[in-house]
Amino acid sequence: ISVDELSNYNF
């Protein structure tokens, strides 16, 4: 689970 700099959540 990661959260990138542009506030896009990747699950």
UniProtKB/Swiss-Prot annotation:
Swiss-Prot/TrEMBL keywords: Endonuclease, Hydrolase, Nuclease, Restriction system
Entry keyword annotation includes Hydrolase: yes
GO molecular function: type II site-specific deoxyribonuclease activity
Enzyme class at the top of the EC tree: hydrolase
EC number(s) reported in the record: 3.1.21.4
Gene Ontology biological-process entries: DNA restriction-modification system
Record's catalysed reaction(s): Endonucleolytic cleavage of DNA to give specific double-stranded fragments with terminal 5'-phosphates
Annotated protein name in UniProt: Type II restriction enzyme PvuI
Species for this entry: Proteus hauseri
Taxonomic path: Bacteria, Pseudomonadati, Pseudomonadota, Gammaproteobacteria, Enterobacterales
Record gene name: pvuIR
